[in-house]
């Protein structure tokens, strides 16, 4: 397949080169012709000559000479390359070629007969302008006979050579959209390799305490780019490293990109990593510092470094001088932390593109070049030779911090970060457990390993009162939470005591302020019912007087026909009547006299001389009242929806075309009756969803309480869900939950279709669905990463933890409820379910009984006026995982066997909060015996219940048994180990415990015999006073022999 050349791109770019040359700025002013020659050298990775070729043609052409004259261009290359260049040599009839000089192609011969071609090029140079000065890339020196003979030919002619590296670099620094897409792809691959491979590998090394050399880890990163899973869908053949990854730690730091990773072992302190990946010849770069257990001082210095990067991003704007950018950052260092001025890197980054580092676009104090929209920079800031005061070992005393990103200069506003790898302390910090916690866990693991047949009794003697099971730890933590809960709730309610809740009064509707404003219609004079649509009033004759009633006072109307008469019955709202759920029960003047109902009667028989029947007026009144009532109620409902709506700021539109955008999404709830597709776009201060019909829904970042991303793993839709702080209006309703989703598979299945297990169509469909899921997930993740970068991570998307999910029914149907870091959510079903954990006071589990397969969960909020949330039908198997999750979130939970009347409970608390907490507060939900006073006694009695208690026969046999039987008994009652909670019993050995058990057993048996004798005497006394019908019934089941009844 022939290699194609992008002709349009060539013409655009060569015109830009000539345009800048003809402007005559800087070195261009002195140049008569430009000569670029490229030889063969495998060691040269970056050179201006090859960069210019790649920029113009898309490929690197070795052993090729390019001469750019004032009115012509000459390319000399091998026959095969000349064939490739013929695609742009024929410019006739090509409108894109207008303004670009004509091309002459010369074929390079393999022998030394190239003199005639060299002479043609020399002649062309002499004819171009003054023909004396040539622009060259002085640093580019290629070996080989062909290059040597050409350079000798140039030197013989005595041309003045001027280095034009800087001006050509500035010309090609502004990237076109196609180039930017390649650089964005390169940046995303770099981010993927860092996140999914390097960061994970470092965490594994730290977790396992491995000894790994920097050089070995760097080699593994280079190998990782050969695997497709890290390349974000790119072809591995188009991906290469810009330079070998640089990994440094343990006090030896050199914050440059020319160094290599040493062979020292990685030290678990500040670990700097720099890596750059090249995609289709375009470079990207990323630098991060991973910190293991950083001290507070290290974290403060790192946060200051992030602040400097933010300042640098703000200064990188179109038209600003590069030196001004550098000075602005240095001013921040001088003002806030002058002691770090000599620690910061000498330059703050450099221009990047086809070449990794553009020397003429370095961000330092001397660079006078102006920034232009479309330039891409690698910004790199770091502090070296910092002293760690808490460091004890030599490698811990010195550390460095280094961060860097690939960024794009925009027209207005700060530069856009292309490498979307999070860099806050919480994202790059690796916090380990302290040694005490590790030792505890190790001891626990060793103890578990020791547990075996015959060893349990031995282990029981070693168990101390300080050792706790997971359940005991959970209970202890819950006990602490219970004490905190009551104290905080009491304090909160005390603070709220002064706030009086404003009771909403029912609106008084006055139709006419005085009688003169009433309409003068004939119907009113004729004592007929008249409806004034303008003032929404029904004027009725009452005792011969036209009386106005506003439509709001009418509850309902009914009409019936009985014989020759039509009856119209009108019912009114009045105190004491049953009102609708949304109607207030408060009247402006409840002491006034109210009309409850009025009934009118009219004849259905037309009298002689009348045109219509009298009942027609009632029929018309009935119809019009219904219409007016409907219109009034619709308007009232809309006004009620608008009540309490907080006015939002206006959305600031970002006119940049590179805004994060997702297409082909549906919105829930629907804007119209039918669902419509649209696109979601992120702007400066919020999102805008635009439907295909043109409807717009704006969601501001500062109004988002929870931003959730529900991947399509195990689901039929992929969702972005926004739970809002304040409701927004669209579709004439208020909404606090808005989500955008797209379907990933067939929601419905054709049951009539005959399917075969190995049907190719089905297999192909499944493969297509898998690819679609992966594609959608990648698109959504890229969108989220761009949004988080755009908002400086002020808006962070939460992904539900599916592993912690459990089934339950918060509404009518069962769904999978999944925790996130700050909420409990279900976003796939509608209506959605979102509970913010910070607003939760406590969780109560109801109907927790052994014989039931499921239980209910009640969520009580800190705002006691808010209705509790019920989640029904949760499987019992989920109880322990839910408890563990709630405990880890520091949420108090209780459980009980009954369902409680929560409406009554919450009303009692709200009415008398002080009395509620004086009586123990929420402790009434605790199971009996878990109070603070009775806890020790309960634990002791529990131990007594669970301790091995032999029967009388067993006791007699034990006298003759060997010691081996004790170990078997201990094995059978290993749970007694867990029940030894008191200080006294945990300190005694097995023999002493057995002896105590025998004594307790003998005492209990004696007490039982005493109790039986007392009960027998009571029964005998009762039988004396009875009639004798059941006299023998009481002694029938007694263990004592029956005695004769006294007479």
From Swiss-Prot:
InterPro entries: Creatin/AminoP/Spt16_N, Creatinase/aminopeptidase-like, FACT-SPT16_Nlobe, Fact-SPT16_PH, FACT_SPT16_C, FACT_SPT16_M, Pept_M24, PH-like_dom_sf. Its main location: nucleus. GO terms for cellular component: FACT complex; nucleoplasm; nucleus. Residues 499-514 have a biased composition (Polar residues). The modification Phosphothreonine is found at residue 903. Signal peptide: none annotated. The modification N6-acetyllysine is found at residues 139, 196, 223, 513, 732, 786, 904. Residues 432-507 form a coiled coil. GO terms for molecular function: nucleosome binding; RNA binding. Residues 492-518, 918-1047 are annotated as: Disordered. It is found in: Nucleus; Chromosome. ADP-ribosylated. ADP-ribosylation by PARP1 is induced by genotoxic stress and correlates with dissociation of FACT from chromatin. Residues 1024-1039 have a biased composition (Low complexity). There is a cross-link at residues 497, 513, 647 (Glycyl lysine isopeptide (Lys-Gly) (interchain with G-Cter in SUMO2)). Keywords: Acetylation, ADP-ribosylation, Chromosome, Coiled coil, DNA damage, DNA repair, DNA replication, Host-virus interaction, Intellectual disability, Isopeptide bond, Nucleus, Phosphoprotein, Transcription, Transcription regulation, Ubl conjugation. Residues 927-973 have a biased composition (Acidic residues). Changing residue 734 to W: In NEDDFAC; uncertain significance. The modification N-acetylalanine is found at residue 2. It comes from the Eukaryota. SUPFAM superfamilies: Creatinase/aminopeptidase. Belongs to the peptidase M24 family. SPT16 subfamily. Component of the FACT complex, a general chromatin factor that acts to reorganize nucleosomes. The FACT complex is involved in multiple processes that require DNA as a template such as mRNA elongation, DNA replication and DNA repair. During transcription elongation the FACT complex acts as a histone chaperone that both destabilizes and restores nucleosomal structure. This is FACT complex subunit SPT16. It comes from Homo sapiens.
